[in-house]
Amino acid sequence: MRQVILLITNRSDISVLDKIHSQMSLSNESNDFFVLYNGTADSLPKTYANIKERFFCFSNDILYTMGYFPLGDSLAPGNCHFPVLKFYLTHPDYDYYCILEDDVTFSGKWDTLFSYYKNDVTVLLSSHIRTYSDYPEWPWWVTLESKEEDFEEKDVICAFNPIYRLSNRALKCIHESLSNGWRGHAEVVLSTILRHNGLTLKDIGGNGRFVPKGEENL
């Protein structure tokens, strides 16, 4: 099993640098690491000069060059899956892609968390996974659209994604669906596409319906 950790950022402060070095220290034959950096390679801050080989740089142009349908003209809110898909398309040989936002903190050891799910074949690991009926007041449901598919309300799923993991199979499915006209906020379109295609989702915390028995409130 080969996994890559992807940290999404446009920052260069000490907090982010510490996170980068922390993840780099875990890199080995099974676990790789890259920074998805919102900026050009030429504009990388000097802070990153010695580790620039770990950077996958992108601009907001990816919103219009990948054949998908974005929400607005910026990554946030709702388009943060674009650089993840871009990385997948240029690095398609990993089994799993674990994505971290740059403000995520974890009080435990990252390698313990990653090792716990090492043999888990679920295509999406995320948190606070809910159906429309669980959380009808969530404002981003209305962004979900598909030109070719119908979906029932019970199959519309949102997931909170400051940290989440997608399998290679999941990303292939998502890429094909987005290319065929699906669109929406990242936290609803990714999970709904996977659910619509009969793939598995797992909530990695709490006690909701997508948390497996015995793994509540881990």
Named regions from a protein language model:
Residues 39-93:
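Active-site-proximal specificity loops/subdomain of glycosyltransferases
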Residues 1-15:
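N-proximal low-complexity "stem/linker" segments adjacent to membrane-targeting elements
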Residues 177-218:
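C-terminal catalytic/acceptor-binding lobe
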Residues 2-3, 26-34:
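Short loop->beta transition adjacent to catalytic acidic/histidine clusters or analogous donor-positioning motifs
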Residues 7-9, 35-39:
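Short beta-strand/turn micro-motifs composed of small residues
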Residues 13-26:
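Short, well-formed alpha-helical segments that are part of the catalytic scaffolds
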